[in-house]
């Protein structure tokens, strides 16, 4: 796995990436509900994801994080955070992570380019799973409320 060095780079610099994420959450006007959540909670979620990225990307381990994000979807519904804001936050984490790697100025050789491409593909699949499970949890909580009031 050529992207292992890049995954480790993300894990080591998770605090810097998280700081960038939190700045963006406060900058985007359409994330009003999300930015009202405690910053400590947002920071902890991001750092847990980033500092253990290598573990989460191993086959079989991603399901553990997916379950956590299904529970997070339910929590976000209960907190009144719109679904689009919750999904947007995941997109921002992925974007900040990939941007950080691209900014490191590695010499552009074929192996390094391949490693970055491999990382983007692996991270993309992982985040797709997280989004899917977040939405599933959110919809499950929404259905429960809808059926209770029907």
Residue ranges and their predicted role:
Residues 2-84:
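N-terminal low-complexity or simple alpha-helical regulatory segments
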Residues 2, 6, 65-150:
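Long, amphipathic alpha-helical coupling/dimerization segments that relay conformational signals between
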């Amino acid at each position: 796995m050529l992207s292992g060095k890049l995954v480790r780079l993300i894990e080591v610099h998770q605090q810097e990436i998280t700081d960038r994420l939190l700045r963006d959450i406060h900058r985007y006007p359409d994330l009003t509900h999300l930015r009202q959540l405690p910053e400590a909670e947002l920071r902890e979620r991001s750092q847990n994801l980033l500092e253990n990225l290598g573990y989460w990307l191993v086959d079989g381990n991603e399901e553990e994080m997916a379950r956590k994000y299904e529970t997070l979807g339910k929590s976000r519904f209960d907190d009144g955070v719109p679904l689009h804001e919750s999904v947007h936050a995941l997109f921002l984490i992925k974007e900040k992570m990939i941007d950080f790697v691209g900014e490191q100025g590695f010499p552009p050789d074929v192996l390094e380019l391949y490693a970055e491409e491999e990382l983007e593909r692996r991270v993309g699949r992982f985040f797709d799973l997280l989004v899917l499970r977040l939405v599933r949890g959110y919809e499950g909580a929404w259905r429960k409320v809808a059926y209770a009031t029907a």
